């Protein structure tokens, strides 16, 4: 039974609420109103709650708790639907002929009304409808009773709610295919002129509700309910009536609030949003937002401004591991052969694990799928398996037009899709809409996660379904310590499965589990991952290790990962592997024990960093990656959670090591790319754009690791920020190729050099990205001594060249920005005086600036004391004196001299695979 909870107005969320706080000044004044049903605005939210707000002030009066609007199964093994809690609309992920999200031409209530029905493939569908009435005290929100068929009672405030349940059965298999429950309040639309009611705006994915006076456009109040708003109701003539409301993207509300904040307003009086919106040069588009809450995924239509990234219509949302198809053979190792197909089926007993990053966010409105169903209700229309374009996605840019359309065009089209006539569809057939649509679901490429909050449990007999290969060995980043698997230099083979897991006889170690040479305490959990993977603190031959436990069904994956570990762990920056044991139910891998992940290194200021500075961390990261690439191994899942920090060695220093080889790919001899037949590998927000393209021009290469490493570089250098923004839209921003390197924009030497490297690594095209050796050779990693030596070598090389030589012209091109117009004006007076004693230097010449650096270095001991004090100690202080004043000098000089990369003098400054290998201009006779 629903229960009521009296509450006060929730604490406003920082961000949007602060943006809107100014809007409320001068508009809200405390007033006392008689709390009658007509004075209440009732708002339903995704979690099933019904909130009573004051129409005048927006104050929360009470909350009626109930079951969630949408509930799906937690044990689905093949498919699921995306449901819209606003009206019960259903969406699928495509069919054999169509790609991407597609809307079904019926809702859950309509499907229940049409049941029982059967699809053409023999699957039966049943539906059940259950009604209930709640009698609520409008003053306190307390439920008086639930009205049932047993008898009436004295009503006070009647609220009706209907529950629709749809189930799918396959007579050829005893398991239930799919089921869902949808609940909605009984509330017809409010009659009357739209202009007489207040207008309401809600934010998708959040609980913010904004109420506006439709006459003046004045913002009346805001309220944050903490959960996305699904419906707005008023009490009229002894019953609920539904009011129209518009849902906007969170970023759109941010955008509007920020634009409002830059407009000058009178010192007093309400803010007129009509005037405000008239100043905005933007357009609002209708999109489909895919979100996730505690019960699973859901969809909701939302307006966005043109600055919000959208997932394109028709984008194939492949699962992380890729489902098997009729044309694909699943091998023992987990590899797949053959060409992919959109006719998807999942292996028996597997869990359909979707790519969350490809779902969550704003999508272009998908087309409507039309198909056939046996014994369909006549009101559902008819048609063949064709699609029609989505509704017009444009919405007005000005606020008052938006308010009017919210009650006319948008209200009619969005809240009542079932009222559209069949003539509005293209290519309609004579009958039956449901069967082929749901059949297409059985054959379509559906990969939606049916996830629930994982409960921490450490039991020997696990209940989880086997891991999909793409999620193999992923350790949850929510764990306090991530000591996930890695590798070690070892020639050990997989141990015999005859060894049984058994407890020790020692009373002091009675909690330990022993499998062969590995022992661990099941209660000492270091981390856990998807599908039943756990990592424990343990022992291997007296050495402290991390013990990674996986299901025995993952034998092929374990073997492949161990083989890659054995091959690659002959490097200090690849985690060490010790051995593998097999018990009756699990595999156990003994791995090097680490003390932190890179995520903890960045985000935990109290963590002992073991003497590792950010530049050292990134250099060791790239050193390990270069080693993998030299072995033709592509990691394919670089992210902070998979980069670990070892404990201090005898000198008190830690190491950065790469871990989690579950998605690694060994490229065959003679090949430099890999296919995506087995799905899109990686993690949301850290994947290269070529992995997400529908029709990439070329197969992905090791450059995908460089892109991921570029994201990690910026994450470390910025102290935890991501170059593609908020996690909700991160992957969509990657697709659009729009990184934001705001933390590296400052015009100082270190950030100028870092910005150049990170920008190259994040190139939207793989070809311009540097290789791992090129990254390591970039000036970003040069010591001060190497920088100074480079300046000296360049100056010596150019000393006798004329100003017309190509190399000198290349150095002087764009030199005005390098020397800041005249470098004489930016050095200290004692140094200026000393330079004038011996020769003349042109203040506009980059070559003369390098000459001054070289000469003062050569004659450092002969310089006056005040000049030496200004320059600092050689090499660190000396070179920083010049790079601090001329932050572009090093990078500019390095680019200009690239044509001399093949010369022996410059080999230390350019990688062996540098793009310039032609003879250096002016190198004759050197």
UniProtKB/Swiss-Prot annotation:
GO MF annotation list: ATP binding; endonuclease activity; magnesium ion binding; protein serine kinase activity; protein serine/threonine kinase activity; RNA endonuclease activity; unfolded protein binding
Where is the protein localized? Endoplasmic reticulum membrane
Membrane topology qualifier = Single-pass type I membrane protein
UniProt keyword terms in alphabetical order: Apoptosis, ATP-binding, Endoplasmic reticulum, Hydrolase, Kinase, Magnesium, Membrane, Metal-binding, Multifunctional enzyme, Nucleotide-binding, Phosphoprotein, Serine/threonine-protein kinase, Signal, Transcription, Transcription regulation, Transferase, Transmembrane, Transmembrane helix
Which PANTHER family does this UniProt record tie to the protein? IRE1-RELATED, SERINE_THREONINE-PROTEIN KINASE_ENDORIBONUCLEASE IRE2
Q: What is its EC number?
A: 2.7.11.1, 3.1.26.-
Q: Where is this region: Disordered?
A: 478-509
Set out the biological process GO terms recorded for this chain's protein: apoptotic chromosome condensation; intrinsic apoptotic signaling pathway in response to endoplasmic reticulum stress; IRE1-mediated unfolded protein response; mRNA processing; negative regulation of DNA-templated transcription; protein phosphorylation; response to endoplasmic reticulum stress; rRNA catabolic process
Q: How is its activity regulated?
A: The kinase domain is activated by trans-autophosphorylation. Kinase activity is required for activation of the endoribonuclease domain.
* CDD domains for the chain: Luminal_IRE1 (cd09769), RNase_Ire1 (cd10422), STKc_IRE1 (cd13982)
The impact of changing residue 548 to A is: Loss of autophosphorylation, of induction of apoptosis and of 28S rRNA cleavage, attenuation of repression of protein synthesis
Using the record, list the residue span of the signal peptide; answer none if the entry has no such feature: 1-34
* One GO term describing the cellular component: endoplasmic reticulum quality control compartment
Q: What positions constitute the catalytic site?
A: 637 (proton acceptor)
Reported function: Induces translational repression through 28S ribosomal RNA cleavage in response to ER stress. Pro-apoptotic. Appears to play no role in the unfolded-protein response, unlike closely related proteins.
Main subcellular location: endoplasmic reticulum
Domain KEN positions = 784-912
Positions binding ATP in this chain are 526-534, 548
Could you describe the post-translational modifications of this protein? Autophosphorylated.
Keyword Ribosomal protein included in the entry's annotation = no
- The identity of this protein, by name, is Serine/threonine-protein kinase/endoribonuclease IRE2
Q: Which family does it belong to?
A: Belongs to the protein kinase superfamily. Ser/Thr protein kinase family.
Catalytic activity annotation: L-seryl-[protein] + ATP = O-phospho-L-seryl-[protein] + ADP + H(+); L-threonyl-[protein] + ATP = O-phospho-L-threonyl-[protein] + ADP + H(+)
Originating organism: Homo sapiens
